[in-house]
Amino acid sequence: MNFIDEVKIYIKGGNGGNGCVSFHREKFIDRGGPDGGDGGHGGSVIFRSNHHLNTLVNYRYKQHFTAENGKNGQGSNRSGKSGKPLVLDVPIGTQIFSEDGNILLYDFIEDDQSFEIIKGGSGGLGNSHFKTSVNQAPRKRTEGEVAKEMWIHLSLKLLSDVGFVGLPNAGKSTFLSVVTAAKPKIADYPFTTLVPNLGVVYVDDEEFVIADIPGLIEGAHQGHGLGDKFLKHIERCRVLIHLIDGSSNDVVADYNTVRFELESYSDYLKNKIEIICLNKCDVLTDEEIQDKINKLRKVTNKEVFPISTYTNIGVNKIVKLALEVIKNQE
């Protein structure tokens, strides 16, 4: 299934049904009173979050959605049937924006949230409403209200507690596969991850959600590579795990490249708590590990954790540290 996180769609509420002009007809009664029923209300357009969905692919090919119109009123004071509401399911993390993308209309952050974006048109009034002492046989009725219509922009930002960042092939997908049941595509070449992957990490009786996005390259915040498109998916996370390829010849340059892209993209990412991990330490000597850690500490002023996602060394420690950070922010 394609991962779709941006769509533009047209929505329209159902129009109200028209009121009816009718007069009571009964044997031996020549001039029955007005008995025109009201029109039914049009259906509303409602968005609802659904935890079973993780992409906006349902809106890629069908882009026009209209709720059902209300039925017209009938004689004998029979009101028209109201139109059915149109319920559109979206993944948790979906944001609804105005057509130009400048105004946030709603943000779905929990399962089964509902948002009535367009109310159906009101039904028109039948002629029975217009009977007066001086007008016993009114032929007046009103038409149903025409419902609103609009184009809107849907944007999906995945919800996770932890986000992985790093250059391509730093080992993020391997880390995800080791600590969760997620099965991302993994190989020893850059850009194995082409779409975001989510996994749930279980620690004793607790759990948190972790997100792996395509690796960043220099210029990602300007649209280079794959990372820029998916950086928004880690904006909501509480902590970043920054993986650095320990086999790289210049781990400091690798770290700085990713940090620059994060800081250039948004202040949200710039100010995230960061856990720095030197990965692939299984292919390094103890002296090489310490040398690279010292270099990273010098530029980051932070603790750097040596790990190997291949041999699982140090991984559990990082998982528990991430959980501790998450709990401290609750």
Swiss-Prot record:
Oligomeric and partner information: Monomer.
CDD domains the UniProt entry points to: Obg (cd01898)
Keyword list, A-Z: Cytoplasm, GTP-binding, Hydrolase, Magnesium, Metal-binding, Nucleotide-binding
Presence of keyword Transcription: no
Annotated residues for binding of Mg(2+): S173, T193
GO molecular function: GTP binding; GTPase activity; magnesium ion binding
GO cellular component: cytoplasm
Chief place where the protein resides: cytoplasm
Needed cofactors: Mg(2+)
Disulfide bond entries: none
UniProt source species: Rickettsia canadensis (strain McKiel)
Similarity annotation: Belongs to the TRAFAC class OBG-HflX-like GTPase superfamily. OBG GTPase family.
BP GO terms, sorted: ribosome biogenesis
PROSITE patterns: G_OBG (PS51710), GTP1_OBG (PS00905), OBG (PS51883)
Localization of this protein: Cytoplasm
InterPro entries recorded: G_OBG, GTP-bd, GTP-bd_Obg/CgtA, GTP1-OBG_CS, GTP1_OBG_dom, GTP1_OBG_dom_sf, OBG_GTPase, P-loop_NTPase
Function: An essential GTPase which binds GTP, GDP and possibly (p)ppGpp with moderate affinity, with high nucleotide exchange rates and a fairly low GTP hydrolysis rate. Plays a role in control of the cell cycle, stress response, ribosome biogenesis and in those bacteria that undergo differentiation, in morphogenesis control.
Keyword Nucleotide-binding attributed: yes
Protein name listed in UniProt: GTPase Obg
Domain OBG-type G: 160-327
Listed SUPFAM superfamilies: Obg GTP-binding protein N-terminal domain, P-loop containing nucleoside triphosphate hydrolases
Enzyme nomenclature, EC number: 3.6.5.-
Domain Obg: residue ranges: 1-159
Binding residues for GTP: 166-173, 191-195, 212-215, 279-282, 308-310
